[in-house]
UniProtKB/Swiss-Prot annotation:
<dbReference type="GO" id="GO:0004826">
    <property type="term" value="F:phenylalanine-tRNA ligase activity"/>
</dbReference>
<keyword id="KW-0963">Cytoplasm</keyword>
<dbReference type="InterPro" id="IPR009061">
    <property type="entry name" value="DNA-bd_dom_put_sf"/>
</dbReference>
<dbReference type="InterPro" id="IPR012340">
    <property type="entry name" value="NA-bd_OB-fold"/>
</dbReference>
<dbReference type="Pfam" id="PF03483">
    <property type="entry name" value="B3_4"/>
</dbReference>
<dbReference type="Pfam" id="PF03484">
    <property type="entry name" value="B5"/>
</dbReference>
<keyword id="KW-0030">Aminoacyl-tRNA synthetase</keyword>
<dbReference type="InterPro" id="IPR045864">
    <property type="entry name" value="aa-tRNA-synth_II/BPL/LPL"/>
</dbReference>
<keyword id="KW-0067">ATP-binding</keyword>
<dbReference type="Pfam" id="PF03147">
    <property type="entry name" value="FDX-ACB"/>
</dbReference>
<dbReference type="InterPro" id="IPR045060">
    <property type="entry name" value="Phe-tRNA-ligase_IIc_bsu"/>
</dbReference>
<dbReference type="Pfam" id="PF17759">
    <property type="entry name" value="tRNA_synthFbeta"/>
</dbReference>
<feature type="domain" description="B5">
    <location>
        <begin position="394"/>
        <end position="470"/>
    </location>
</feature>
<dbReference type="GO" id="GO:0006432">
    <property type="term" value="P:phenylalanyl-tRNA aminoacylation"/>
</dbReference>
<dbReference type="InterPro" id="IPR020825">
    <property type="entry name" value="Phe-tRNA_synthase-like_B3/B4"/>
</dbReference>
<dbReference type="Pfam" id="PF01588">
    <property type="entry name" value="tRNA_bind"/>
</dbReference>
<dbReference type="InterPro" id="IPR005146">
    <property type="entry name" value="B3/B4_tRNA-bd"/>
</dbReference>
């Protein structure tokens, strides 16, 4: 948003503050801001008065205009704009003038020498596209520098508004923040008011419109706007249309309240604010026909939609040259509803941009009254009706900030007078109490001030974070800190062929419902996207969303991990999420990921920190009933893993078999053991792979525990590397392939000794669990 320095000066005393200081302080304490200079380079460009217009003697499409450019100096200028009339004020580039990157010279048009150029708004850089010469209706002395007339050279503050600061989307809002930051007195421009009068039908059918105020003005004259309004619009990057439309835009920029004017003759029987009907169509002001549905809020009459509420007006009911009577609208629409309509229709306007960030419901009438005043002043007419339908009056929320909590966050107590001065400048009603401060959240800050910590932020940012003392963070002197540990985990996973992904922490409810998981406890009040308003409580949904996206882009082989935060009412924690799908990377032949690749990776991560996980059976609805497990560490649950349930994979249209895991990495790292020396083995290992057929329901973890106890110290490693179920092993059975790594510390194990140990183990398992050695 662009805000002229001179316009700010109408609301706050800025005589001792430069534009550069404003931008610097805003960037540090409010929103990012920069300074730019308005206008292109002009030299030798002046105001001229047309004294005579003649047709070109040979070229009928041209006119020869005599222009007074000094008290006694007149020049002839040839132009294609035949709308120029005697008495018009124009902007003239004299011979050798500079207009931006263009240099103007005398030029002959079939025997007539043009000693200058009449400039359009487009040539002056005021509008992207314009037709005809720019006409100035105000009376200036011929020869007046065009820079002075057009305001070129004025400093403009350009600010980048964050989604929660809709109150800053106006000159008034920026001035309010500046008043607080610089401790400057505000100015109070006069604000005319118009009481309710007359009768006009207005009905609000949809609860997403809390307030609708309409003013009928009869007998207006549609014409060009006065220069001061045009200049403000140009400085803010908005094209001038006509006096009525320009005034609605002018007031929107000034007060932050979008307005819309309807041609009253096109309104049949009053105004109804309702949801659009499916298949209903409207031709909008940009000339496009758009199909609507029930998600879109419209302003309609008894016959048809007239406008998309908060987004864009309809072409048929728009203001035209022959419009005589108008209905001026000022309203409050639900930000989420406006955002949904804007996204569905693919339109973002200055109006929707503000409604999406919440407008001040209590300023609906005051902003409109100022627009009415300007319309009567510059377009004439008479107010016939003022009708205000305010369904749900704004009730300010009470927020109490205890002094003690402020101290915990800021590191110091506040001075009552200073806090009161800041809150008063921000126009936040407050009462200083013995142990804190209580405020009533004003309507212009209802979107972002919800809790005591929001007040702490307001006080600290306005005061300036540089005024708070800081101390060097003292960390315990230990060998491996949290960050180093995470880097070690990331390196291990990358070495295994996995790629790190970083997902948004915001989720919608669809995946949670599909996975039959409880919805997250935390819901964002002001989400960037209305469909993603939950703060995730698991990484699995984020990873599945990534998998779906990659599949749709024909990337079916995936091995990814995410180290990210999940959120709960009690706080947030870091977790590790893993997703494997399709073929493994970096292999000479196609080799698919298997479930026990997950357990191997998990065990490898634990081994980095001197830990050993315990795997147990699990029953999670979104995982395959026979291919899943839980991870325990020293008897505590720290994660789960498994194959995504085939029905869910099919619903998500995922190709291949997705395997997922989630580890509570903070809890794992909290149990990290210091590394200790282990002597390099002197003797070679003996590896034996055996396949055991057993009941499908048998817990494999029990077999692994018994294997360790039976073989004892000679067993260096035991792990499952494959599971098979099918007709070759019989119904209700499964074949589990186990790898045994045997090693002696005193000498090389002979094959006979290794075979004897394996046979003894198989016989023991057969007797205890009824397993058979698969041949």
């Amino acid at each position: 948003m662009k805000v002229p320095y001179s316009w700010l000066s109408e609301f706050v005393e800025l005589s001792d503050v430069s534009p550069e200081e404003i931008a610097e302080k805003l960037s540090l304490r409010s929103v990012e801001a920069t300074v730019e200079t308005f206008g292109i380079d002009l030299d030798g460009v002046v105001f001229g008065k047309v004294v005579e217009v003649k047709e070109h003697p040979t070229k009928k499409k041209l006119a020869v205009v005599k222009v007074q450019v000094q008290e006694h100096i007149f020049i002839d200028v040839v132009t294609v704009d035949k709308s120029v009339r005697e008495g018009d004020g124009v902007i003239v580039a004299l011979p050798n003038a500079k207009v931006g990157n263009m240099c103007v010279t005398e030029r002959e048009f079939d025997g007539v020498v043009s000693k200058g150029l009449l400039l359009s708004a487009q040539e002056l850089g005021l509008e992207e596209k314009s037709e005809g010469v720019l006409k100035i209706h105000e009376d200036f002395k011929p020869g007046t520098d065009a820079n002075e007339i057009l305001g070129f050279g004025e400093k403009i503050i350009e600010i980048d508004i964050t989604p929660n600061r809709g109150d800053m989307l106006s000159v008034r809002g920026v001035a309010r923040d500046l008043s607080a930051i610089f401790r400057l007195p505000k100015k109070k421009p006069e604000e005319p008011t118009y009481e309710e009068t007359g009768e006009f039908f207005i009905e609000i059918e949809d609860e997403d419109c809390k307030r609708y105020r309409g003013v009928v003005i009869e007998g207006v004259e549609i014409k060009e706007s006065p220069l001061y309004i045009k200049k403000r619009l140009w400085q803010c990057g908005i094209k001038s249309i006509n006096n009525v439309v320009d005034i609605t835009n002018y007031v929107m920029l000034r007060d932050g309240q979008p307005l819309h004017a309807f041609d009253l003759s096109k309104v049949e029987g009053g105004i109804i604010v309702r949801s659009a009907k499916k298949g209903e169509k409207i031709i909008t002001l940009d000339g496009e026909e758009r199909e609507l549905d029930e998600d879109i809020l419209v302003i309609a009459d008894r016959e048809k939609p007239l406008a998309v509420a908060g987004v864009i007006g309809g072409l048929e009911s728009g203001i035209k040259e022959n419009t005589k009577d108008i209905l001026l609208e000022s309203a409050y629409f639900n930000p989420f509803r406006v955002r949904k309509a804007s996204k569905k229709l693919g339109i973002q306007t200055e109006s929707s941009y503000r409604f999406e960030r919440n407008v001040d419901i209590e300023r609906v009438d005051r902003a409109q009254d100022y627009a009415v005043y300007l319309i009567l002043k510059h377009a004439g007419g008479k107010v016939k009706v003022v009708k205000d339908v305010y369904r749900e009056k704004y009730k300010p929320k009470k927020v109490f900030l205890p002094q003690g909590k402020y101290i915990r966050y800021a590191g110091e107590s506040y001075k009552n007078e200073e806090v009161k001065e800041i809150l008063d400048a921000l126009e936040i009603p407050n009462e200083i109490m013995r142990c804190g401060v209580e405020v009533l959240v004003p309507s212009h800050r209802s979107f972002d001030i919800q809790r005591d910590v929001d007040l702490i932020e307001e006080i600290m940012r306005v005061k300036g974070y540089e005024h708070y003392t800081s101390e060097t963070l003292k960390l315990p002197s230990i060998a491996n800190l949290w960050k180093d540990n995470l880097l070690e985990v990331k390196k291990y996973l990358r070495d295994k062929g996995l790629t790190e992904v970083i997902n948004f922490s915001f989720e919608d409810s669809k995946l949670y419902e599909l996975l039959n998981l409880p919805l997250p406890e935390l819901e964002v009040i002001n989400p960037l996207n209305p469909t993603q308003r939950y703060m995730r409580n698991t990484l699995i949904t984020s990873l599945l969303r990534t998998a779906v996206y990659n599949d749709r882009n024909y990337n079916y082989d995936q091995a990814v991990f995410e180290l990210g935060k999940v959120f709960f009412k009690e706080g947030e924690e870091n977790r590790l999420g893993i997703l494997l799908k399709g073929n493994k990377p970096r292999t000479l032949k196609e080799e698919k990921w298997e479930p026990y690749d997950l357990t191997e990776i998990i065990a490898g991560i634990f081994a980095l920190f001197g830990l050993e996980p315990e795997f147990r059976n699990a029953k999670r609805n979104f995982l395959h009933p026979y291919v899943q497990g839980e991870v325990y560490l020293e008897g505590e649950f720290v994660g789960f893993f498994g194959k995504l349930h085939p029905k869910i994979a099919k619903e998500l249209e995922l190709k291949g078999e997705p395997f997922v895991a989630e580890i509570e990495i903070e809890r794992v790292l909290s149990k990290k053991r210091l590394p200790h020396y282990r002597e390099v083995a002197k003797f070679p290992p003996v590896v034996r792979d055996i396949a055991l057929v057993m009941d499908k329901e048998l817990d494999v973890n029990k077999l692994l525990i018994d294997t360790k106890s039976q073989i004892g110290e000679l067993l260096e490693e035991v792990r499952v590397f494959d599971v098979y179920t099918g007709e070759k092993v019989g119904e209700g059975k499964k074949s589990v392939a186990v790898r045994l790594v045997l090693r002696s510390k005193t000498g090389s194990l002979k094959d006979e000794e290794a075979n004897e140990l394996v046979n003894k183990l198989v016989n023991y398992l057969k007797e205890k669990y009824g397993v058979e050695l698969r041949t």
